[in-house]
Amino acid sequence: TKKVFQSGFVWRVVRQKWPDFEEVFFGFDIDKILLMPDEMLEQKASNPAIIRNFNKVKTIRENALMIDDVRRQHGSFATFVASWPKDDVVGLWEFLKKNGARLGGNTGPYALRMLGIDTFLLSRDVEAYFVEHGLITGSVRSKRSLKTIQDTFLTWQQESGLSFQELSQIVSFSCGDNYVGMAN
């Protein structure tokens, strides 16, 4: 939920209001959230203590439902995510996008990082790297491009022993606005 609200908002504001979010939404207890009727959700969405974006507030219950469905099928959401094949991180992104609410783009990967799952991010600089080096053509988010990007990160990880997060940061700093050059 935090990453859903941070998407498109000033992250500092979300962080400042986060304790109020936790209080308003029962500490994000899935079972309690699932019991909330529509009227209660609407009431909570108008609470000035939180960010009053009803469309994003609705995702709290929608994503709680997704988590509940997964835990019913797999024992727990954490087990499901942790057991996802490490060489198919893009598949996990797709699962979150398809089954969750507002978890597409980089929101899903950011949420996974927050859960301790190693993933790369498709920042503008990472995307630019893959395009500038001719590794992908066309849409960066196409299945073909995502497979190429994932396979490249897997190769780099096997060669370097670094995490996807570390590799993602290195790529980001190697081109675009964040380029960090070497002094002569």
Each language-model region and where it sits:
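Alpha-helical ds-nucleic-acid-binding substructure associated with the helix-hairpin-helix region
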Residues: 26-102
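Short, solvent-exposed positions on alpha-helices
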Residues: 12-13, 58, 165
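C-terminal accessory module of base-excision DNA glycosylases/AP lyases that mediates lesion recognition
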Residues: 82-184
